[in-house]
Regions:
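Surface-exposed loop/turn motifs in large extracellular/passenger domains
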Residues: 3, 41-43
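Left-handed beta-helix
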Residues: 7, 12-13, 18-19, 24-25, ...
């Protein structure tokens, strides 16, 4: 399946977006970010930004869902998890398969 990218979203020229990825309006996928959804879907909500060198990956049975107005800090890894609206994932944080983070949360930088 090919990615679906809203016309108002920004995807950096060297970002990688593969498979069943949906990117909402006004979202930003920045330099060096990798979004891979070959085996389960990834959804990036409206107004969310995925900063430089992040990795978002989905596994069978573990889609990755990132809500609206979220910030995913530089070099964070989101793997088959759900991130609620208006949540900040700090730089270098790692969130793994099956994790569910609520809305209006902060995940500290380098947290696992």
């Amino acid at each position: 399946m090919k990615p679906v990218i809203h016309e108002s979203a920004f995807v950096a020229e060297n970002a990688t977006v593969r498979g069943s990825v949906t990117i909402g309006p006004e979202a930003g996928i920045y330099f060096g970010a990798v979004l891979r959804a070959e085996t389960a879907p990834i959804t990036v909500g409206e107004g969310t930004n995925i900063q430089d060198n992040c990795v978002v990956h989905a596994d069978p049975g573990f889609p990755a869902v990132i809500g609206r107005d979220c910030t995913v800090g530089h070099a964070a890894i989101l793997h088959g998890c759900t991130i609620g609206d208006n949540t900040l994932v700090g730089m270098g944080a790692i969130v793994l398969n099956g994790a569910v983070v609520g809305r209006d949360c902060i995940i500290a930088a380098r947290a696992l």
